Amino acid sequence: MRRINLNTAEPEFDKSDPEGYRAAQLKVAPVIGGETMAGGYYVVPPGEANCPYHYESDEEWLLVLEGRITVRHPEGEDELEAGDLVCFPAGPAGAHKLTNTTDAPARMLIVSTANLPAVAVYPDSDKIGVWTPGRIDNIMVRRESGVDYYDRET
């Protein structure tokens, strides 16, 4: 049995993340041998978010492990605390942004289905991201750059 202890795990920061989105992350599924589920363990410093407001083609569950996190969602904002578990359904109803508005770090675990290709929509910036198996055809585009289904086919 493969396992990870989140109390001693050390997520890493991506130095390319811009200010406001600097959260440490550890992808946990590969560590424990997950194949059909995905998971991320995050440590979000004060004043930072883990990613922009978005919704996905996968269902996600958020468990706050320590601290408090403010969740922006389609109905407004809510502050979650350690022990709170919420579900973000696939599609627009599951849109969310997770921001630490406190003065102490927040630790959280996000678990989701792992359907590929994965699609995320970013309503604030009107972007759509697609992630494919092997990541060879990943793309991030603005909605206005879309083309007709039969473009260049006939």
PLM regions and their residue ranges:
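Glycine- and acidic-residue-biased ligand/ion/polar-headgroup-sensing regions
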Residues: 59, 63-70, 74-75
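Ligand-binding loop in jelly-roll beta-barrel domains
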Residues: 90-117
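Conserved short histidine dyad/triad with adjacent acidic residue
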Residues: 25, 40-56, 93
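A short, N-terminal "cap"/entry segment at the start of jelly-roll beta-barrel domains
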Residues: 1-36, 121-154
